[in-house]
Amino acid sequence: MVFGELMSSAGDSGPGYVLNDFDAVPRLSYARSIDIRDSLSDLIRIQRDSYDAFIGIDEGSSGGIQSIFQSMFPIRDPLGRAVLEFVSCNIGEPQYDEYECIKRGITFSVPMRITLRFVVWKVQEVSFKEVKYVVDEGTLERSVKYMKEQEVSIGDLPMMTSYGTFIINGIERVIVSQMHRSPGVFFDSDKGKTYSSGKLIYSARIIPYRGSWLDFEFDIKDIIYFRIDKKRKLPVTYLLKALGMSNNDILDTFYDKVLYVRSDKGWKVPFVVDRFKGVRLSYDLMDVDGNVLIKANTRITLRIAKKLYADGLREYLVPFAGISGLFVATDLVDPASGAVIVSAGEAIAAEHIVKLELFDISEIAFLNIDFLTVGPYVLNTLFLDRHITQEDALFEIYRVLRSGESPNLEAVKSFFKGLFFEPDRYDLSVVGRIKLNSHLRLDIDENLTVLTKDDIVHVIKKLVLLRDGEGVVDDIDHLGNRRVRSVGEFIENQFRVGILRLERMIMDYMSSVNFDNAVPCDFVNPKILATVLKDFFSSSQLSQFMDQTNPLSEVTHKRRLSALGPGGLTRERAGFEVRDVHPTHYGRICPIETPEGQNIGLISSLAIYAKINKYGFIESPYRKVIDGVVTDSVEYLLATQESDYYIADAGAALDENNRFVDDMLYCRHGGNFVMVKREDVNYIDVSPKQIVSVAASLIPFLENNDANRALMGSNMQRQAVPLLKAEAPLVGTGMESVVAAGSGAVVLAKRDGVLHRVDRVLYPVIRAFDKNKDSILVLIYTTEKVQRSNHNTCINQRPIVKIGDYVRTNDVIADGAAIDRGELALGKNVLVAFMSWQGCNFEDSIVISSDVVKRDVFTSIHIEEFECVVRDTPLGPEKIMRSVPDVNEESLSHLDDVGIVNIGAEVSAGSVLVGKVTPRPPVSLPPETKLLVTIFGEKVFDCVDSSLYLPPDVEGTVIDVHVFVRRGVEENDRSLLIKQSEVNSFRKERDYEIDVVSEYFYDELKKLLCSADLPLNGHADVESLLAAKSLEALWEIGLSNPKISAKVADMKGKFDELITEAHSKFDQKIDKLNYGYDLPQGVLTIVKVFVAVKHNLQPGDKMAGRHGNKGVISRIVPVEDMPHLEDGTPVDIILNSLGVPSRMNIGQILETHLGWAAVNLGHRVGRMLDSGEEEGPVVERIRSFLSEVYEGQKLKEDVASMSDEALLKFANRLRRGVPMAAPVFEGPKDAQISRLLELADVDPSGQVDLYDGRSGQKFDRKVTVGYIYMLKLHHLVDDKIHARSVGPYGLVTQQPLGGKSHFGGQRFGEMECWALQAYGAAYTLQEMLTVKSDDTSPGRRPRVPYSESYYIKGDSNFECGIPESFNVMVKELRSLCLDVVLKHDKEFTSSNVE
């Protein structure tokens, strides 16, 4: 990869630089390193790439749907009479677009169809053993009796949207990627925790992608065992013998041989240096001549052994008795009789030495076991039961895995082969094979994804080497041993599950069907695959309801990595190690962003530049360094690769030639920091922020915050509610525009072009056209207007371009929720003072000025959806109607004639949104009721009110109504009106497109005809003649020039093609609209009402900054009482200064100072703009001042190149403040902030004199005042406050339900009782436990003091019943066979107790 487009917040530079109105003001950036931008262009690439690989879009992809079907087919009849073959797969187009699927509540999917070929062979005879086929005499191949090819539907496949989400039943969902242990082999130890002796117990585990796990482990006696799927362990030699190895094969495989040759003086043995390292001699070391070189009991070091070898020692003598205790490699046989003296693997004993001399054996091969560097572990395991055969081993393994069965030998062999050696039942995957080859240094084909005998042998060899002290165990938390499973892999696995079920069904059907009349569609049930996919998307732990609070929460959710889920960890069993930050996370997984609760460390986020390769391993980019010079080449490295290189920090100083300034640099190498020469450096980080995630990269001065507060800050940004008017932060990091563009919340231009029309009111689309080679291209961008998100926040896109603007590809042309001119805007810049104020900001409480509420600074719009379902009941259909029984007319005033609320109506708690009645069985009226009906003529309703009412805690404005009527059911007037409005919108869109095309061709045709030779017919010139004609008339003008005539004809053809296409799109939309709606069984109509609720800031709402500085609003103070500056400007927010030192998030103070400088710089620019020419030319003063502000920045050159008009326009945009960028780990230093404060004509300390708004007196000390970017979080007090008098009870315990969602009660628990006991409040306690408790029987309600009976009847007796919780306790005691009976003392009542 070549070094990509440099990140530059200054936009285009060069002479005549002009800032477009729709562009954000460039930021004064303090970045000291050059960034790459191509890696940041698509933040949700992790989702799209994975799904595209599954679909098979990527070229050269080995996966894909096609390969899944090819692996399944052909399917043959069990008797071989017929075969079902796969021909091709076709994925269709979605019936409805994404918006329509959300609106209708259906799944965004595409139909899948496969072409199958069913072939029936001609057979002569069929038996259980074989089938005799009829052979064609010409081709000598089997004759075909019948063949049918057919396209068959296999169900719908959910499609990923352009934003990386899935729409399931009208709800956007995200498939979270999963971190799991990579397939392959892993070596581990118990770290001495198993046995009290502290001895290390080593183990190995082969983990496949699919199939049985194979474990190897030592025990305390150094015997090697193996387990399959964690069942009962067996000696490892059982497995080796099941693989066909004999005792000699096992010994030859795991041990080297040493040949001892008899001589007159002893046994001659080859001298090998490595075998003597650290050995203490048990006998004198002699050369072959008998000369003593080293005395016995001497320890030989490696240096001594090498010196002996250098002195010419090639063989040494071992005394005849010195072979005692050595293990023979092969059977020692008496040459005369053939009797075995010593079996292979046995140790030489004293009696054996005598026999060896007696039988005159001249040479012996011993196993190289010295108990120091080579241990007898495999040998000892073999001798546990060395006489078992292969058949015995196979049966023993079978008995462990399938106890209670008695199969034959063939079944046992087939079972064992299927465990590890058949692709249908065992799959290492390509990743597992690569890891296995790398770990064991094997050279086996990557496509062989089953185990081999060599794999198992080499695993045991490496395990033995570990026990012998060679090598180290694996770190399971190393990212080289963990991989990411993304959405495409999950769906592929589910797809394979569904295909296997389909295959079994086809096999069953083949065994019973008559082949003569069968066609391919008879074999396939499309519901099988659809059911599997539906279950996964609906109920999987990793298929999650998308977090759509704001654009950042969407991006973060799509980039999330989870260690939980199927095949992963559980939060209860996950230890500290797997949750902790690992050195290999650098540049791959963010060390900051993770949940605070029990999922901490298990759920993380992908680092900002990281990407996932085709094998699922995370890679991080680095710039290549050659001979101390940083090049523009960027390479992505795996965690296993980067440990071999020296990697410098991105902040390392470079000269103008990109060469390191310092001779020695700190570099990362092998997980540690080392100091190396610059010539030895291999790579350098691409950016200082590459270690953090998207959310953490938005926190300015992150390096000045405590890690815990940085974690809270990154998490709370995702909870920020989009506000009524978005405002980008004055102090940002430069990542705001990147996140906004990559989130999908903005509308980006698809091509370069000129804005032709922007319709902001009637139809929310932006229309542009672009010349695509020789043809016109009309692009219509639909914007979302006041749509509801998953979390009830408001999504509203606003065009920021105007007619005539020239836009480039990927320019932002419409802002979304929480977006300001293409920059992420989650909160507001507000004036903050750090001080105490009457104790109202005690313990992180926040004091707010009433002016903030009045100006709607933190006001947000939330959209609530309410649904009314009209069903067909056994007594008749429910009906939507305005005349609802027992409801007064005032409550129905905002309904239309149909009975549905009008758009724009102001509704409050209890308002009727949809009037609906449900039939009820006829009831017999009492005589007095019949008399009243006869006298007064009242209508007797045979239905009950089942209308949709607004819940108690909602108040707002109805902004939209959707009516879905079942296809075939008569539509009401409201649904017809809604449909007509949609038709008008489609027609308007079509007409706009035709107008754009016609206008373009009209201009082009006039230009062409002006060059032609036309008769003037009394006109002064050709242009006046053409101007008087319409486009249709211009097409009909006769031309004598054949070349121009041909061009006109070509233009007419293109024009007709575009117009036809516009009409075709319109007709398709009308057809879909007229098709109707497929509603669930028994549902006639669904009415959805959307109510916009305005949430003003109020006490109890939660607010936070970007540094983890959170708090709850305690009081809204009148603006006149708030502290104010010397010029009378009141402070917006007061924060407690004591919340800073203990939390150690100093970043908020630095942001305060920098924000104070930014605003005051803007004020100074504003004063220059408002001043006259007395002090000199305004333009030149502004240019000089901005050049000083942007000193050392690229923006300084841009300011110098601006025209006077462009500069004034640019300066006017700076009135509210000069935007700053403090990138992560590259924030401005103290001296730089002080310089800006001095330029802004304010105190360099950042503190000012504040005056008490109530007394007007100045506070004793200066106060830190500045501008902070504050967020309003979605923890709103309106959603939390709740009260209940009487409500639902649990069926079993008869206790009130809990929580606001269940309209539950407030528990008065044990500790609350203790509190009342401590105060001695006996009557209050009795009242809480009885009168105000959970008695569920209205007939036994106690008479409460100060109730109706007290005031009207004068009854002041205080009578209490038994609370239901006491009855529950009694019943539980009775379930324990303890009979509890309450005795009532009539003399003891509360009325006679004095």
Swiss-Prot record:
Annotated keywords: DNA-directed RNA polymerase, Nucleotidyltransferase, Transcription, Transferase
Record-linked Pfam families: RNA_pol_Rpb2_1, RNA_pol_Rpb2_2, RNA_pol_Rpb2_3, RNA_pol_Rpb2_45, RNA_pol_Rpb2_6, RNA_pol_Rpb2_7
EC annotation from Swiss-Prot or TrEMBL: 2.7.7.6
UniProt KW Ubl conjugation keyword: no
Catalytic function, reaction form: RNA(n) + a ribonucleoside 5'-triphosphate = RNA(n+1) + diphosphate
One GO CC annotation: DNA-directed RNA polymerase complex
Domain of life: Bacteria
InterPro entries the UniProt entry points to: DNA-dir_RNA_pol_bsu_ext_1_sf, DNA-dir_RNA_pol_bsu_external_1, DNA-dir_RNA_pol_su2, DNA-dir_RNAP_su2_dom, DNA-dir_RNAP_su2_hyb_sf, RNA_pol_bsu_bac, RNA_pol_bsu_CS, RNA_pol_bsu_protrusion
Gene Ontology molecular function, alphabetical: DNA binding; DNA-directed RNA polymerase activity; ribonucleoside binding
A single GO BP: DNA-templated transcription
Top-rank EC class of the record's enzyme: transferase
NCBIfam families the record matches: PRK00405.1 (NF001616), rpoB (TIGR02013)
Entry's family note: Belongs to the RNA polymerase beta chain family.
Protein name, per record: DNA-directed RNA polymerase subunit beta
